[in-house]
Amino acid sequence: MMQKIEHIGIAVKSLATSIPLYESLLQTSCYKTETVASEFVNTAFFKVGDSKIELLESTTPDGVIAKFIEKKGEGIHHIAYEVDDIYQEMNRL
């Protein structure tokens, strides 16, 4: 069963310009940044109530996030749900 939205992933061209923008829009500070080398992204996280916003910046021009932005522009890339049993939810969907 889906419990809540765990986080919303937003593809951005630049964390350097997007972090201050989202801090202003969300009225909260970025609490964590990290590089996920296996996914070719840098990420930044913001807490919003019981959920999070994750900004994703590509580290390579041919990465998934870079291709997403090239095709669709910056914006919502994914919504992650917290679930009791991932396999049960996959089968249900």
Ranges and model annotations:
Residues 2, 10-52, 59, 88-91:
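Core segments of cupin and vicinal oxygen chelate
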Residues 5-6, 30, 76-77:
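Short, contiguous strand/loop micro-motifs
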Residues 7-9, 45, 78-80:
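Short aromatic/hydrophobic contact patches that present stacked aromatics
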Residues 9-10, 66:
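Short, recurring structural edge motifs at helix starts
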Residues 25, 64-68:
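A short, polar/proline- and glycine-enriched secondary-structure boundary/capping micro-motif
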Residues 55-63, 71-73:
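Conserved secondary-structure micro-motifs at functional edges
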Residues 68-93:
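Mid-chain, well-packed structural core segment of small domains
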